[in-house]
Regions:
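Amphipathic, Lys/Arg- and hydrophobic-enriched alpha-helical face
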Residues: 24-42, 59, 120, 140, ...
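A short pre-motif secondary-structure segment
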Residues: 130-134
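Sigma70-family region 2
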Residues: 13-14, 40-41, 51-68, 87-90
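Short, charged helix-capping/linker segments at alpha-helix termini
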Residues: 13-22, 32-51, 152, 175-180
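Residues within the DNA-recognition helix of helix-turn-helix
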Residues: 27, 48, 158-161, 165
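C-terminal edge and immediately downstream basic/flexible tail or linker adjoining helix-turn-helix-like DNA-binding
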Residues: 11, 97, 104, 108-110, ...
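Arg/Lys-rich amphipathic alpha helix in sigma70-family domain 2
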Residues: 58-65, 75-95, 109, 161
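Structural recognition of an alpha-helix C-terminal capping motif at a helix-to-coil junction
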Residues: 33, 47-54, 67-79
Length: 180
């Protein structure tokens, strides 16, 4: 746990809204990252963040204090986002998103980073979510496993396949040379 985190959780359990506000401030960006990785839509992700923090607060009594709080919170956020995605898929036909590169990006490093982001965002959710959690939020395999509700071996496989797909897409765009 982050220093003072256990104390903040305990105060929140006792009804201290200022303590809960501090938890929200500490984790809102990471929860947003989890949500946008699943939903691929910033507006929906913002809604999911609010809903995730509401649900987490309502269910805080279910949190096991011996476990890592961020993993529990990211699991709540992932579940909220997945539910929103299922609901959206029932209501709307799937739409393809197009991410055009920013013409102002003249530096090669920025172009490569943009190309990598686009390649990751174009992955199917099964590969995209583990990639974002691992490489943007630096979660380990067991944490990703808990957040997504899949086995660690499945996480490992999806990360491997996700990296292979990203490499192939970057090679196809000429950003990197395809390595056997």
């Amino acid at each position: 746990m982050i220093p003072g985190e256990l104390e903040l959780v305990q105060k929140s359990l006792a009804g201290d809204l200022e303590a809960w506000g501090e938890i929200v401030r500490r984790y809102k960006e990471a929860v947003y990252g989890v949500s946008v990785a699943i939903l691929r839509n910033r507006a929906d992700a913002e809604d999911a963040v609010q809903e995730a923090f509401i649900r987490a607060y309502e269910r805080l009594h279910r949190y096991d204090l011996s476990r890592k709080f961020s993993t529990w919170l990211f699991t709540v956020a992932a579940n909220v986002a997945k539910n929103m995605l299922r609901k959206r898929r029932r209501q709307d036909p799937p739409a393809k998103l197009h991410y055009a590169p920013d013409p102002a990006e003249a530096v090669w490093k920025e172009e490569v980073e943009q190309a990598v982001r686009e390649a990751v965002w174009s992955l199917p959710e099964a590969y995209r979510a583990p990639m974002v959690l691992r490489y943007w939020h630096e979660l380990d395999l067991s944490e990703i496993s808990q957040v997504l509700g899949i086995r660690p071996g499945t996480v490992k496989t999806r990360l491997h396949r996700g990296r292979a797909l990203v490499r192939a897409r970057l090679a196809q765009r000429g950003v990197i040379r395809d390595v056997v």
